[in-house]
Amino acid sequence: MTTKFVFDLLAPDDILHPSNHVNLIIRPI
């Protein structure tokens, strides 16, 4: 959940593009 919070700030579009949000989480990890 911490990762989601961090990326939520970097990718506020998560609401419009949840698919991209998932990809962003996988890349850094």
UniProtKB/Swiss-Prot annotation:
Classification via Pfam families: Corona_NS1
Similarity comment: Belongs to the coronaviruses ns4.9 protein family.
Name of this protein: Truncated non-structural protein of 4.9 kDa
Record organism: Bovine coronavirus (strain LSU-94LSS-051) (BCoV-LSU)
Taxonomic classification: Viruses, Riboviria, Orthornavirae, Pisuviricota, Pisoniviricetes
